[in-house]
Amino acid sequence: MSLMKGKKGLIMGVANERSIEWGISQKLADAGAELAFTYLGDALKKRVIPLAEKLNSNITFSCDVEKKEEIIKLFEDIKSQWGEIDFVVHAVAFSDKSELSGEYLNTTRENFLRSMLISCFSFTEVAREASKVMKSGGSMLTLTYESTKAIPNYNVMGGCKSALEASVKYLARDLGAKGVRVNASSAPASASF
């Protein structure tokens, strides 16, 4: 299948072979896409580089989405590597694990703000920078999860994903006028590719 032949895109947030974003990466590669990947820190670098190589990619970038300058540099590096890209898959999320269980009332200000920055606002900054190097007709995808119900052991992430879904609507409005699609995919935890 060559539906994506000649298309180039960035995958952000692959954690391991069991992650949804890894399944997405495999499907894109199988369809002919050329992929680049991001990682954060040495532990993820050791996992992401071998995974990228399995899909014939040697293009990996370090990117801490908590740092605006790293997002800017990421897309400058992509421009240097490829010129333009066709798509971005944003699968970046974070919360302090100790605050996912128990009562939402116990969410700390620090974890709320950090979780919202990484899990939600980073997509806005990624979209802003990606749009500078994205071809008309390009696509941006972020991953979300059931945000209409209070899910046990999800706490602050529920709020982050609700905010992310709202952000997608506004980004779709802004970037749609420039020929770029923006969507969120809400896959169940048991999704398989």
Give the location of each predicted region.
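Structural signature of beta-strand start/N-cap positions in the alpha/beta core
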Residues: K8, E34, E84, S139, ...
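Conserved glycine-rich Rossmann-like NAD(P)H-binding loop of the short-chain dehydrogenase/reductase
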Residues: A33-R47
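Conserved hydrophobic beta-strands of the Rossmann-like cofactor-binding core
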Residues: K8-L10, V88-A93
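Glycine-rich phosphate-binding loops of nucleotide-dependent enzymes
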Residues: A29-A31, G41, N58-T60
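Catalytic loop of short-chain dehydrogenase/reductase
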Residues: G13-I20, A93-R128, K132, S136-K178, ...
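Rossmann-fold cofactor-recognition segment
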Residues: A52-E69
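Canonical Rossmann dinucleotide-binding motif of NAD(H)/NADP(H)-dependent dehydrogenases/reductases
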Residues: S2-F37
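Conserved Rossmann-fold cofactor-binding substructure of NAD(P)-dependent oxidoreductases
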Residues: E66-Q81
